[in-house]
Structure formats: structure tokens, C-alpha cells
Design a protein with these regions (language model features):
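Structural marker of alpha-solenoid helical repeat scaffolds
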Residues: 64, 97-99, 132-133, 167, ...
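TPR/TPR-like (Sel1-like) alpha-helical repeat modules
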Residues: 418-445, 468-469
């Protein structure tokens, strides 16, 4: 209660000070303010991004307190926060000549140097500030770390955070930021360890449980991700992000019915969440509830008509429903919004193939391979359409062009074997057939689609027996 009284008293004092200052600005009377009061006025304007008024306050302050290092530092801070970092640095360097033992000056210098991208110089300035500091070192080290976090220098930030942690191992904000930095550096196990230490001291932090869930999600431990999100939701049942990410984890576990329920809960909390609507549609699609999936995909497009993935989801559902003309329209709509997505082009190719438009299908598959040369299915479909058009040599050429990307895909090798066999190039066929068997002997059935009589040839049978010992007995059965 006393702290609350102090807060309101302080706030009331500030309002009185600001009122007097505003009157002075409006030429309604002169007022005198001490340096501390000017600091409070300037900080108030900085917090609300009123830079012009902050500069006015500095000017009045220096008029009343000529040569005040504190106010001159505030002026440099204003220019730094305005984005005029070079000008701010000049001011700080001038002040260094008269305030060489002022730790706050070197803190400000370090922050400005970080803004300018001069990270090594910033470190030197901060280290100077630390050497001149004798109180609250853990807070100073923490503030330095935040400056490096702000410019994405997480390794450097960690050095200062770990020093701060050694000085004050019980301070939760330090633990939190250490965990955050390790997360940003993709050292997920260490990040988890520090968040768990945090929870040992403060088990009711919904944000830390949520962050922990995200880390397990990144590690693809989706069950643990669900559990962490559940803890966050138990603490705060209105925590929309935790509900949404719980649904994502459930979907990744293949628990689509549960995911559908959780996405609906997420939408109740965030009715305009375009991703929740789209992912709900995707979960229903996985459950083969295509009509309902389309409804949710449509709702996603109503929230954001430019969200290509939702239009694509509608196309996929219509493809599964064999409504190929509808699928064609929505695949085209998705591509019109995002021409660089290989999945969209692949689906367009499939739709054209089902409609018998083989030339258009081949163009779409070719575009897919251009955008993603590792898409083996697109290469295989492109080659097979050439084969169906009587161009077996071209089919071989396509898969050979793809081979540097797809050499480790068994089906690619089996297709090459079958196409070579069709052209009576048995030695080449044997070579690719054996490569395919080495990669996955069970995938040999791919050749039946093209050259089933291959498997009656003695040399191919011998290879099957070599790499697939149970093949002979399976054949008899």
C-alpha cells in the first residue's frame, strides 16, 4: 500500500511539474526547475516520442543550469532516440573530455555505437562503464545485454547476462533473457534449461510456459509442446497464443480431431486470426472432411483475401473431391497471389493432368522443379507425362537433368531403369535398378507402372534376390 501511495504521489508531482513547464513553453510565466525535474520532464517526453518538446526541455534546462553534464547527456540521448546517432556520438565525445569518470556517459556511448553498428567499440565503451560502476552492477550488466540484444548480437549479450547472473542468480529477468538469447542462437536445450530454472522459482509464469512450449515445438517434441501450452492456459485461459500453438502441436502429432477443437477455441479468443482459420481448414482436410474444410478456408480468405495458402487449401480440397475445374480456378487464384510457391505449381500440374491437359501439366511441373529442384515427385510426373506422349528418351533426359538433386530417391532410379528397359538399354536399366534396390528394395514395384515385364528377366530377378531375399517366396504366394 505504501508503494502504491508513493507511485500516485510521484505521478501527481510529475503532472504538477509538467503543468508548470507547459505554461512556461506557452509564455504563461517563468518557472525554475532543478536538474532532476528537467530529467523527469525530458524522460516523459521521450517515453511518448515527443522529441521536439524533449529538446525544448533540454534547452530551457541548460539555460537554467549552464554546463550541466546530466542535461547535455540527455540531449545526446534525445538525438540517439531520434535516430541521429552520429550527432549524438559527437556530443558524447565532447562530454568525455570533462566527464571522463562518468559511467552513465559510457553507457550512453555504448548504446549509440551499437545503433551505428560499431559493436566492438560499443563493447569497449560498456566495459569502461562497468569499470567505473560500483553499485547495482547486475542491473548495469543487464542493461548492456539488452543493448546488444536490440542489435541481434546475442552471443555478446550472453557474456554480460552470465556475468549479471553470477552476481545475482535469483534475478528472474536475467534468467529469462539468457533463455531468450540461447533460443535466438538455436541452442534450444540450453534455452529450455534456463526457462526451467525460471519456473523453479516462479512456476506461475504463463509466458515462460508458453516460450518453453515453443522451444519443444522447434525441437519437434510436440507432445511436450502441448503439455507446456496446457500449463500456460491453466494459468491464463484467455492466452490466445498458447491455445493457437497447442493446436499447431496437436496437428503435428496427427491428432487432427483434437486440433480442430483447439483451433476453434483459438478462434473464439482471436476471431480475426487468419492462420487459425486456415490451419483449422487444413486439419479438417486431413480428416477428409473436405466440404467443412473449404468453409474454414473461405473464412480465412474473407479475413485476408491476399492470403494465398487459404486459396490453395480450397484447391487441394476440390482436387481430392475430383472437382477439377473448381480446383483449377482456386490453384490459379493461389498462384496469382504467390508465384514463387512450388507446392502451388505442383498442385496445378496435378489438376491439369487429371483434366487431360498434359502440356499444361508439364509446364506446371517444370515450373515446380525450377522453384524447387529437389521436388522428386514433380520430376517424376514431368518425366512420366513425356513417356505417356511417346517420348521415352525425353523422359530419361528429364530424370538425368534432375539426378544431381534426386540421385538418392529410389523411385527416380527405378523409373530410369524402366525407361531404359523400354528402349532396350538393358545394361543401363540394370545399373539404375540396382541403385534403386540399394536405396530401398521395397520400392521396386515402381517399375510395374512402366515395364512390368522387366521383373521376368533373369538378371533383374537375380538382383531382387540379392537385395530382397524374401522376394522369391513372396512371388510364389
Amino acid at each position: 500500500m505504501d508503494k502504491e501511495k508513493d507511485y500516485f504521489q510521484e505521478d501527481g508531482d510529475l503532472q504538477e511539474i509538467l503543468g508548470r513547464f507547459e505554461n512556461m513553453l506557452n509564455q504563461l510565466g517563468a518557472s525554475f526547475f532543478d536538474v532532476y525535474e528537467f530529467e523527469r520532464i525530458i524522460d516523459h517526453y521521450l517515453d511518448s516520442n515527443h522529441f521536439t518538446k524533449a529538446i525544448d526541455a533540454v534547452k530551457f534546462g541548460i539555460d537554467q543550469h549552464p554546463g550541466s553534464a546530466t542535461l547535455l547527456m540527455k540531449e545526446a540521448q534525445i538525438y540517439a532516440e531520434k535516430g541521429e546517432s552520429s550527432k549524438a556520438l559527437e556530443m558524447v565525445r565532447s562530454l568525455e573530455k570533462i566527464e571522463e569518470s562518468n559511467n552513465e556517459l559510457y553507457m550512453l556511448k555504448g548504446m549509440i555505437l551499437n545503433q551505428l553498428g560499431r559493436v566492438n567499440e560499443a563493447e569497449s565503451a560498456f566495459d569502461k562503464a562497468v569499470s567505473l560502476s560500483f553499485e547495482n552492477l547486475d542491473d548495469i550488466l543487464y542493461d548492456i545485454a539488452l543493448s546488444f540484444e536490440f542489435v541481434n548480437q546475442y552471443k555478446i549479450a550472453l557474456r554480460y547476462l552470465e556475468k549479471a547472473h553470477r552476481r545475482n542468480p535469483k534475478k528472474l529477468n536475467i534468467l529469462y533473457d539468457i533463455a531468450y538469447c540461447y533460443d535466438r542462437l538455436h541452442d534450444f536445450d540450453r534455452s529450455i534449461g534456463y526457462y526451467e530454472r525460471y519456473l523453479d522459482r516462479e512456476p506461475y509464469s504463463e509466458n515462460v510456459w508458453y516460450n518453453l512450449g515453443l522451444l519443444y515445438y522447434k525441437k519437434e517434441n510436440f507432445q511436450k509442446a502441448v503439455e507446456c501450452c496446457d500449463f500456460a492456459i491453466a494459468i491464463n485461459d484467455q492466452y490466445a497464443s498458447a491455445v493457437f500453438n497447442k493446436a499447431n502441436a496437436q496437428a503435428n502429432l496427427g491428432e487432427y480431431e483434437e486440433a480442430v477443437k483447439t483451433y476453434k477455441e483459438s478462434i473464439q479468443l482471436e476471431p480475426e486470426n487468419v492462420l487459425a482459420h486456415c490451419y483449422l481448414g487444413e486439419s479438417l482436410e486431413k480428416l477428409e472432411a473436405y466440404s467443412e474444410a473449404i468453409e474454414w478456408y473461405r473464412k480465412s480468405t474473407e479475413i485476408d483475401p491476399s492470403y494465398a495458402e487459404a486459396w490453395y487449401g480450397i484447391a487441394v480440397c476440390y482436387l481430392f473431391m475430383k472437382s477439377y475445374q473448381d480446383a483449377l480456378y482456386y490453384a490459379g487464384k493461389a498462384i496469382s497471389l504467390d508465384e514463387e510457391n512450388p507446392d502451388f505449381w505442383f498442385t496445378l500440374g496435378n489438376v491439369h493432368a487429371h483434366l487431360g491437359a498434359h502440356t499444361d501439366a508439364m509446364k506446371a511441373y517444370a515450373k515446380t522443379t525450377e522453384l524447387d529442384p529437389y521436388d522428386d515427385e514433380a520430376w517424376l510426373n514431368l518425366a512420366h507425362l513425356s513417356y505417356l506422349q511417346g517420348e521415352t528418351a525425353k523422359a530419361i533426359s528429364i530424370l538425368k537433368d534432375a539426378y544431381s538433386y534426386t540421385f538418392d530417391i529410389p523411385e527416380v532410379n527405378f523409373y530410369l531403369a524402366a525407361y531404359h528397359y523400354k528402349l532396350h538399354k538393358t545394361d543401363q536399366a540394370l545399373k539404375f535398378f540396382e541403385k534403386g534396390l540399394k536405396l530401398d528394395h521395397t520400392a521396386y514395384i515402381a517399375v510395374r507402372k512402366i515395364s512390368p515385364d522387366m521383373l521376368d528377366e533373369p538378371r533383374f530377378k537375380d538382383l531382387l534376390k540379392k537385395y530382397f531375399p524374401s522376394w522369391t517366396s513372396r512371388k510364389r504366394n
